[in-house]
């Protein structure tokens, strides 16, 4: 992906202003990439809840990346870029309209390559890991329930933390699902570090609070919880996932951990 470190130069052709609001696309995705220079605040420890082993750890100065998944086609010669949703599967296109360089001259290159835009940031990170593979739809439902439960249990403002998923394959061949919770403040504010400090009783209370939130909600009762709403899992920042997250997935996950 490309990091636009120095910002953007807009087209000199300015469209006439209207009262219509710009369309929101919700194309941003956050990925955990890690940083070898991270500071481990709380070493990786294994906690047992019933017959389940859950690993938790917290770090500071850890690294994530925000990726814009729109279809940007970029000129490698001058940096010109445009969004083209008609060629989602193409690796490159030829610019039929021609384009100018930032200096106003016609660019000799007409071949535009598909690229994604992104930027890296560092913050405090907490890992809650299970040695199993959890499908994305189920794992997203769980991580959003965890964010609600952890923030309420620890008294953290909900918008001060966020989360994402990270999968890795262990040497044994077993897949590990990592629920990555992080401070939204660049550089970190110390909120999620408290997760890494938790003992078994405290972790269990966080999970029970998460279960309580999704179980007490009544959305999707006619479909056995095959939906989510703004009272349980949905919020402004996860709108792109509203069609796949389900309250039932989170309920089943936490009940399995806590009571089986």
Per-segment meaning from a language model:
Residues 1-260:
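Extended, highly charged accessory segments
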């Amino acid at each position: 992906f490309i990091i636009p470190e120095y910002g953007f130069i807009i087209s000199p052709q300015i469209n006439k202003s209207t009262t219509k609001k710009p369309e929101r696309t919700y194309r941003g995705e956050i990925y955990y990439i890690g940083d070898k220079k991270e500071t481990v605040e709380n070493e990786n420890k294994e906690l047992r809840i019933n017959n389940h082993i859950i690993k938790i750890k917290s770090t500071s100065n850890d690294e994530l990346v925000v990726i814009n998944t729109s279809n940007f086609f970029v000129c490698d010669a001058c940096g010109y870029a445009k969004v083209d949703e008609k060629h989602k599967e193409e690796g490159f296109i030829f610019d039929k309209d021609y384009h100018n360089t930032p200096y106003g001259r016609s660019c000799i290159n007409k071949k535009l390559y598909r690229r994604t835009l992104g930027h890296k940031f560092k913050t405090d990170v907490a890992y809650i890991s299970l040695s199993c593979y959890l499908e994305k739809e189920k794992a997203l439902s769980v991580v959003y329930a965890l964010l609600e439960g952890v923030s309420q249990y620890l008294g953290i403002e909900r918008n001060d933390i966020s989360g994402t998923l990270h999968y890795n394959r262990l040497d044994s061949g077993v897949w590990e699902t990592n629920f990555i919770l992080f401070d939204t403040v660049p550089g970190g504010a110390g909120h999620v570090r408290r997760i890494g400090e938790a003992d078994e009783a405290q972790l269990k209370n966080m999970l029970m609070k998460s279960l309580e939130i999704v179980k007490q909600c009544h959305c999707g009762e006619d479909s056995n919880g095959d939906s989510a709403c703004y009272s349980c899992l949905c919020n402004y920042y996860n709108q792109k996932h509203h069609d796949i997250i389900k309250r039932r997935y989170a309920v089943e996950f936490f009940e399995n951990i806590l009571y089986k």
